[in-house]
């Protein structure tokens, strides 16, 4: 019985910590092929400047696809081949914010975009 109570207590602690981290995306919309959009992600509940950050996406009926990541100091970025040369990831550590500038958009870029720590 003691083990069961300890397990429930541990789960509650872990869930409580996870719930403090918040990432809120904005900036999506409808755009014609060839157009541009800028996504933003407002982070809270952790020291944003300590973490690499990523953008991932999920196209309708498909799995998650990694798009890009950026180092904590912005000194290093990397992109999926499918978006290289068209998308630019950036961040503002003073504002706890992550961005994704998307240019030359294509039909295949249609997806739900998420920022991730």
Curated annotation (Swiss-Prot):
Gene3D superfamilies documented for this protein: Immunoglobulins
Residue stretches making up the Ig-like domain: 20-117
Ranges where the record places region Framework-3: 78-115
Keyword Secreted part of the UniProt annotation: yes
Span list, region Complementarity-determining-3: 116-117
InterPro entries reported in the protein's UniProt record: Ig-like_dom, Ig-like_dom_sf, Ig-like_fold, Ig_V-set, IgHV
UniProt keywords, alphabetically: Adaptive immunity, Cell membrane, Disulfide bond, Immunity, Immunoglobulin, Immunoglobulin domain, Membrane, Pyrrolidone carboxylic acid, Secreted, Signal
SMART domains referenced in this protein's UniProt entry, alphabetically: IGv
Location(s) in or outside the cell: Secreted; Cell membrane
Principal localisation: secreted
One Pfam family from the record: V-set
Keyword Protease: no
Domain of life: Eukaryota
GO molecular function: antigen binding
Modified-residue entries (Pyrrolidone carboxylic acid), positions: 20
Purpose: V region of the variable domain of immunoglobulin heavy chains that participates in the antigen recognition. Immunoglobulins, also known as antibodies, are membrane-bound or secreted glycoproteins produced by B lymphocytes. In the recognition phase of humoral immunity, the membrane-bound immunoglobulins serve as receptors which, upon binding of a specific antigen, trigger the clonal expansion and differentiation of B lymphocytes into immunoglobulins-secreting plasma cells.
Name the UniProt record assigns to this protein: Immunoglobulin heavy variable 3-11
Organism, as annotated: Homo sapiens (Human)
Classification lineage: Eukaryota, Metazoa, Chordata, Craniata, Vertebrata
Gene that encodes the chain: IGHV3-11
């Amino acid at each position: 019985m003691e083990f069961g109570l300890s397990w429930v207590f541990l789960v509650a602690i872990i869930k409580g910590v996870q719930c403090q981290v918040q990432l809120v995306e904005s900036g999506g919309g409808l755009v014609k092929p060839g157009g541009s959009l800028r996504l933003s992600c407002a982070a809270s509940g952790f020291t944003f400047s300590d973490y690499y950050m990523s953008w991932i996406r999920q196209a309708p009926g498909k799995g998650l696809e990694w798009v890009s990541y950026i180092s904590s100091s912005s000194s290093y970025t990397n992109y999926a081949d499918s978006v290289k040369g068209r998308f630019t990831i950036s961040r503002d550590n003073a504002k706890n914010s992550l961005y994704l500038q998307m240019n030359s958009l294509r039909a295949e870029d249609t997806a739900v975009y998420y920022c991730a720590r």
